[in-house]
Amino acid sequence: MAAPLPRSLSCLSRAVGWWSRQPILMTQSTAVVPVRTKKRFTPPIYQPKYKTEKEFTEYARKAGLVIPQESLERPIHLACTASIFDAYVPPEGDARVSSLSKEGLAQRTERLKKNVASQLSIRRIKESDPNFKVKDFPEKAQDIFIEAHLCLNNSDHDRLHTLVTENCFPDMVWDIKYKTVSWSFVESLEPPQVVQVRCSSLVTKSNTYGQVTVRMHTRQTLAIYDRFGRLMYGQEDVPRDVLEYVVFEKHLANPYGSWRMHGKIVPPWAPPKQPILKTVMIPGPQLKPGEEYEELQREAHKPQLA
């Protein structure tokens, strides 16, 4: 039994020796190693409990909830127009040219054409405002004009909003925040007169606006002071004759609307306005610490002995 063991060992040694004598071949092998990455999250598909909006609304009503209706439309409140449509053009020299001359005849013909358009507009205004009368309107317009300008004296902007339109309000209060306005009405040189009436619609045919142009020849006083109390424009004790063409507007579609001042028409032949008096600061003397300006004035005016 001991003889076969050495024979098997010799066979194994021969095989190992033969394998060791073989040339070694260098080969490259690719290995795929699985690497775990971050798993992407996919949200589940949302399945609403109520498939239609009607089912959701019915369920909310049963639960006692009131869902406000969402509207993509934004309402716009058009209380007034943005400008004066078909503005009245005052004739040269306030129509004082003789009707026998060529210029006077042309002015009279143009006035007749405008009167026809004014009569049609008056008819449309009376359909919405039956109380409108051309004879009574000038006095009412003059009262609105006087009260609106008196609101500038005490800066009553709340009352001014009810007398002028949103288009006219910025023009009246512009650049008078730090100023003092003193305006007064002296007298009316000529009775106010309606020179033009226009009626137009905006956005829709039923949304109509009426504009009435009133000629006013009055005597007024105006003085504007800056924030330091220095006079910038006009004089309080010197009245001046003023010829103005004032436009009044009313939103006829609004049953609670009223006539308000909308703007003024300045004719091209009107005289230029008085320029504003500009005030400048005069630099005083440089004071040392502890000195006062009054002491320097006393020393400057102190009599000197000869």
Swiss-Prot record:
It is found in: Mitochondrion. Signal peptide: none annotated. GO terms for cellular component: mitochondrial inner membrane; mitochondrial large ribosomal subunit; mitochondrion. One of its GO terms (biological process) is mitochondrial translation. Keywords: Mitochondrion, Ribonucleoprotein, Ribosomal protein, Transit peptide. Its main location: mitochondrion. InterPro entries: mtLSU_mL45, NTF2-like_dom_sf, Tim44-like_dom. It comes from the Eukaryota. Pfam families: Tim44. GO terms for molecular function: structural constituent of ribosome. The keyword Ion transport does not apply. Component of the mitochondrial large ribosomal subunit (mt-LSU). Within the mitochondrial ribosomes, required to direct the nascent polypeptide toward the tunnel exit and position the exit at a distance from the membrane surface. Belongs to the mitochondrion-specific ribosomal protein mL45 family. Component of the mitochondrial ribosome large subunit (39S) which comprises a 16S rRNA and about 50 distinct proteins. This is Large ribosomal subunit protein mL45. The lineage of its organism: Eukaryota, Metazoa, Chordata, Craniata, Vertebrata. The gene is MRPL45.
